[in-house]
């Protein structure tokens, strides 16, 4: 690695000012990131205390707010549950910063894959267009979407709390099955890899029912409790769904949804949260509103377009 062109501390400092990195540097950091991620398992083992972060969707100034509230990396151990890009105005800066932080402090930050870490989805919901506007070509989008194929898909805190972007799959009811999935690919339209990134809990259903999102399933309390029992887990923390209060708990407090993008799409008026998990595995939801810069920042995307139903 040529340190004269690639200095992580310099990159992080630049990104914290919301300045994009050169295309050549993006290639270097994504190549290094793939080298790092290939050594990580599908299901990462994490020790408490750890702060868990849900969807951030390119809301860069709110990501900076997360580090102010939760503590800077590496002082705080972080687990991000995916959906770093699309919809927000600064997806490039957001994923660039998180990638650089992962490279700089690999044991203090874990990045999981969300359903938006996908070529197909990012071509529709903003990241591709943002890369084209900011770089004039799709090369940076290609670098990052290739890197997305390497991200882990789940994590376990202290062998007790299962963490994933979306949830459960009828095709992978044991964590051992998730450990052997081939994750090094574009998110498929169906199957276990797709399901765990796309599925949602539903308190009004039992079992698995095909999701109205067009991918994944709605899953009920019964299969959730069975999954926990069979895998000797105590709780599930997941993201993927907008929560007006920033979080939601379901199924006798056995499942939590954490949402970390306040005032989503600059119009939803919702709160956001991060989950602090201590050594006793107690969960504290730290809620926050949109950062002032996010409220005043001029959009680079057309947020007047209709949001797809699955998004809200």
UniProtKB/Swiss-Prot annotation:
Cofactors named for this entry: Mn(2+)
Compartment annotation: Cell membrane
Cofactor-binding details, from the entry: Binds 2 manganese ions per subunit.
Keyword hit for Cell membrane: yes
Keywords: Cell membrane, Hydrolase, Manganese, Membrane, Metal-binding, Methylation, Protein phosphatase
Name of this protein: Protein phosphatase 2A catalytic subunit B
Role, per record: Component of the Sca1 complex, a regulator of cell motility, chemotaxis and signal relay. The Sca1 complex is recruited to the plasma membrane in a chemoattractant- and F-actin-dependent manner and is enriched at the leading edge of chemotaxing cells where it regulates F-actin dynamics and signal relay by controlling the activation of rasC and the downstream target of rapamycin complex 2 (TORC2)-Akt/protein kinase B (PKB) pathway.
Encoding gene (name): pho2B
Binding site for Mn(2+) 1: 55, 57, 83
Oligomer and partners: Component of the Sca1 complex composed of at least gefA, gefH, scaA, phr, and the protein phosphatase 2A subunits pppA and pho2B.
Gene3D superfamilies: 3.60.21.10
GO molecular function annotations of the record: metal ion binding; protein serine/threonine phosphatase activity
Documented EC number(s): 3.1.3.16
InterPro entries associated with the record: Calcineurin-like_PHP_ApaH (IPR004843), Metallo-depent_PP-like (IPR029052), PPA2-like (IPR047129), Ser/Thr-sp_prot-phosphatase (IPR006186)
Taxonomic lineage from the root: Eukaryota, Amoebozoa, Evosea, Eumycetozoa, Dictyostelia
Catalytic residue list: 116
Family per similarity comment: Belongs to the PPP phosphatase family. PP-2A subfamily.
UniProt catalytic activity: O-phospho-L-seryl-[protein] + H2O = L-seryl-[protein] + phosphate; O-phospho-L-threonyl-[protein] + H2O = L-threonyl-[protein] + phosphate
